[in-house]
A protein has these predicted regions:
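Short beta-strand element of the conserved SAM-dependent methyltransferase core
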Residues: 12, 101-104, 174
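Extracellular/lumenal ectodomain signal focusing on beta-strand-rich modules
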Residues: 86-88, 100, 171
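Hydrophobic/anchoring residues in structured secondary elements
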Residues: 89-91, 174-177
Length: 201
């Protein structure tokens, strides 16, 4: 049985070097614009949180689904790390996509993203209702209610770190509302309940 309206998000988080660079960038923009600070991530999937989740059991089942290099079929069937190209900066009127790095997954990489969601759905089961997000892959750099001109100006004024032309995502993270909250509408209500290193891919 699920609790209607209690969401869960599944993130792909960058490897340590890119994570550090993106975290500094996010922190700088948050200080400049008064927005929240958050962990750099790409949203892989959204779920509905079942009642009385046994987190250690969920983590163990997901860990068992991590692809093992060299095992037949592992690259197609298991959870694995993924490297994506970025194609510049983007902006959107949505609070959580106000300013972001746009990703450019190839057809094969899109298939890999879809396969990762399928693995999650298969491991978690139907009660979680795991599904891909309705928005394009991206890594947010700032959240906020920005005017269009402000967003455009930020894109014009922001140099892109060449080290972020390609980003490897090597960790799966589960996020749910903290105790007492029922939505993920506020960053302050986010609680990371699971962090799982993925295969080398």
């Amino acid at each position: 049985m699920t609790v209607a309206g209690i969401p869960c998000a599944w993130w792909l988080v960058p490897e340590a070097g890119r994570h550090e660079r993106l975290s500094r960038w996010i922190g700088t923009l948050a200080a400049l614009h008064g927005g929240p600070v958050f962990e750099p991530h790409l949203t892989l999937a959204l779920s509905t949180l079942p009642e009385r989740v046994d987190v250690p059991d969920v983590r163990a089942r997901l860990a068992a689904a991590v692809a093992v290099p060299g095992r037949t079929g592992a690259a197609d069937e298991g959870l694995q790390s993924l490297t994506l190209n970025t194609v510049g900066l983007g902006h959107d009127p949505h609070f959580f996509r106000a300013f972001h790095l746009r990703m450019a997954p190839s057809q094969v990489e899109r298939q890999t993203l879809a396969a990762l969601v399928r693995v999650l759905h298969g491991v978690l089961g139907p009660a979680w209702d795991t599904r891909p997000p309705a928005f394009a892959p991206h890594v947010s750099l700032a959240y906020g209610e920005w005017t269009e001109e402000r967003r455009r100006q930020q894109v014009r004024d922001t140099p892109i770190d060449p080290e972020l032309a390609r980003i490897r995502f090597d960790t799966l993270v589960g996020v749910r509302p903290r105790a007492g909250a029922r939505t993920l509408d506020r960053v302050a209500d986010w609680e990371i309940f699971l962090r799982l290193p993925l295969s080398q891919g």
